[in-house]
């Protein structure tokens, strides 16, 4: 979570909008993020990274409904119209991306080949919770790898905070506009922040 916050904050400081939506993404399904703090006494919300908002850039984080296809479709369109922003959609559990498979198949994996549309959207898919029960343990990495063709998208599995930090920053700074599918072992991605500079 620290590497993620550092990546977001550094992009905001460089005048890039950062946007994330998904079920329970403000807190993080596994209580790893805490991007939005809730005051227990009065119910008010505090989002520390909003302090870095200036000019036309903004940090926006939205808890969305369990309507994966519609939310991912909206975020895909937002990313298409905001090519300099870091736009992310997080599945509460990686399996929940099943509900958005049509968006992945028709747009994320194929829009560049079909319509010459380039997009930098990031899919954050928690992965690897063996024993967590059906529909809660696998982001189906093989499904995304099977969709890879002609450099249409990037599929990564960062194993250190530094790798995740650099992947998010690279998504905004690289000249190539490709969707990024990021399979995250949230509970195991804890380490020193070496390499985050």
Model-derived regions, located:
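Conserved small/polar residues in nucleotide/adenosyl-binding loops
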Residues: 185-192
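Phosphate/diphosphate-binding loops
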Residues: 91-93, 99-101, 105-112, 117-184
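Residue-level marker of positions within ordered structural domains that often coincide
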Residues: 79, 149, 191
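Non-catalytic terminal/interface segments that mediate subunit docking, oligomerization
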Residues: 1-84, 89-112
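Short intrinsically disordered, low-complexity segments
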Residues: 90, 193-194
